[in-house]
């Protein structure tokens, strides 16, 4: 893009696209994921009652996206756990966050400056996960836009999308927390990334991959940092989401509502239903008796 050449950002964007995630960025992802689990209601009790269930829930938080995307592509769901090094690293982070003496690791990671850095690094890994999912789907189903979006979304936000299953591991059942019913910010921003990367891979967006990677990473990191510093849940997607909802999905008044309004204006009283008639007759018979 000419903008990148004008501001001499080509080398920075290309360098970011070649940045290795292991071990430091993966470690940040594991720490923040396990901390998110620990901060769930009742998670500490589960860690004392059943360390195995706590470990399994932590691995779902860390590798849920890879597991879900593997299922969608008819691959073995345990394939993401075949990397012993990553699995051991995630297990080490789980142990330190939950069982480190004096809670040293969790207390240090909870400090705002360090948590900002770790969260920013986790957002960088989100970009790579989304792009990896889109590319993986594109290699099997070329130009299948919907499949690429779905797999990229699953790989980037799978931990949230399978949260109901993860809750069952901890003995919790809250179907109202389904991410599809009420999506959290990470799920929304991951869906946005899956859409734009899929459009780029299908050549609907005239932009190079490393340029789009730089733009999306910059957007997610700066926005997440702003939200943490301000302690606010508002994000730039709220306005777009509200506009699309009001434009496409708000239903007009139903016929029943229209009839009710018309009767109210005319001063007419709607006829009682059969159940109401039976109730009144029963009350009248009681009074008579």
Swiss-Prot record:
Domain of life from the UniProt record: Eukaryota
GO biological process terms on file: fin regeneration; regulation of bone development; regulation of bone mineralization; regulation of release of sequestered calcium ion into cytosol
Catalytic activity: K(+)(in) = K(+)(out)
A UniProt-annotated Pfam family: TRIC
Main location: endoplasmic reticulum
Keyword Transmembrane recorded: yes
GO molecular function, one term: identical protein binding
GO cellular component terms listed in the entry, alphabetical order: endoplasmic reticulum; endoplasmic reticulum membrane
Parts of the chain on the Cytoplasmic side: 37-49, 104-107, 163-183, 231-289
Bias-annotated ranges (Basic and acidic residues): 278-289
Ranges where the record places region Disordered: 260-289
Keyword presence, Nucleus: no
Binding-site residues, a 1,2-diacyl-sn-glycero-3-phospho-(1D-myo-inositol-4,5-bisphosphate): 122, 126
UniProtKB keywords: Endoplasmic reticulum, Ion channel, Ion transport, Membrane, Potassium, Potassium channel, Potassium transport, Transmembrane, Transmembrane helix, Transport
Purpose: Intracellular monovalent cation channel required for maintenance of rapid intracellular calcium release. Acts as a potassium counter-ion channel that functions in synchronization with calcium release from intracellular stores. Activated by increased cytosolic Ca(2+) levels.
Name used for this protein in its record: Trimeric intracellular cation channel type B
Gene that this sequence comes from: tmem38b
């Amino acid at each position: 893009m000419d903008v990148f050449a004008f501001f001499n950002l080509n080398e920075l964007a290309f360098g970011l696209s070649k940045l290795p995630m292991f071990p430091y960025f993966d470690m940040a992802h594991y720490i923040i994921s396990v901390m998110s689990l620990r901060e769930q209601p009742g998670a500490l009790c589960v860690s004392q009652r059943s360390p195995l269930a706590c470990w399994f829930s932590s691995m779902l938080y860390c590798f849920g996206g890879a597991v879900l995307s593997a299922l969608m592509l008819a691959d073995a769901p345990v394939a993401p756990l075949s990397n012993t090094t990553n699995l051991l690293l995630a297990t080490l982070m789980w142990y330190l966050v939950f069982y480190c003496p004096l809670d040293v690791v969790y207390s240090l990671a909870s400090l705002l400056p360090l948590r900002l850095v770790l969260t920013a690094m986790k957002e960088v890994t989100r970009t790579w996960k989304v792009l990896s999912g889109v590319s993986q789907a594109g290699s099997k189903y070329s130009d299948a836009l919907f499949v690429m979006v779905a797999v990229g979304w699953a790989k980037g936000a799978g931990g949230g999308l399978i949260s109901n299953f993860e809750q069952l591991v901890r003995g919790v059942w809250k179907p109202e927390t389904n991410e599809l019913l009420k999506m959290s910010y990470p799920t929304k921003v991951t869906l946005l990334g899956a859409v734009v990367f899929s459009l780029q891979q299908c050549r609907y967006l005239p932009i190079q991959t490393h340029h789009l990677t730089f733009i999306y990473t910059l957007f997610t990191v700066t926005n997440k940092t702003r939200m943490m510093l301000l302690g606010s849940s508002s994000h730039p997607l709220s306005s777009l989401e509200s506009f699309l909802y009001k434009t496409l999905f708000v239903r007009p008044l139903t016929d029943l509502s229209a009839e009710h309004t018309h009767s109210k204006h005319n001063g007419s009283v709607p006829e009682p239903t059969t159940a109401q008639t039976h109730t009144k007759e029963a009350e009248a018979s009681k009074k008579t008796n």
